[in-house]
Amino acid sequence: SKCDAAGPTHTRIGDDKSGIHGGAYYIPDDKYNEFMELYHRDVISKNKLEYLTEKQIMTDSSPIAVDLDLHFALDIENRVYSQEHIDDLVDIYLAELSEMFQFSESTAFPVFIFEKEKINRVPDKNMTKDGLHMIIGIQMGHDAQCILRNRVKDKVAECWGDFPLTNSW
């Protein structure tokens, strides 16, 4: 549905070439799971182009959200990163978090990795797109998340530096 008084939860970036119109939308909590199932069915599983972004909640704190968008030349036909790269990414974040927080030996929290089933070749834009999302189950304010991102950015770029990226970190 269109935005209500709570403001948009999602925005859609328009792309005239693809016939995708921009907009802002409000998905209520009680419809979110249904929305995600429909989105997966109609967009992700059919590998359709879509430019929908979820607005990050700007409360005092929220789980740590990491979004890695990887762009390559169109001739890249297979996923470039491996499970080892993902493990290194998680290790880099955990090392930085241990510098920012005091954890006891028994501290445990979830780390979720989300990735598409396959890369997305976009001939119209002469590129191949890939990427992943990571959610770390620690509550952290938005400003602190920005600090964390700045602290890990160069380390991730160094670790994944052999990738033939066409975009920057």
Where are these regions (language model features)?
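Signature for HUH/AEP ssDNA processing cores
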Residues: 1-132, 136-164
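Structured partner-binding subdomains within large eukaryotic complex subunits
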Residues: 165-169
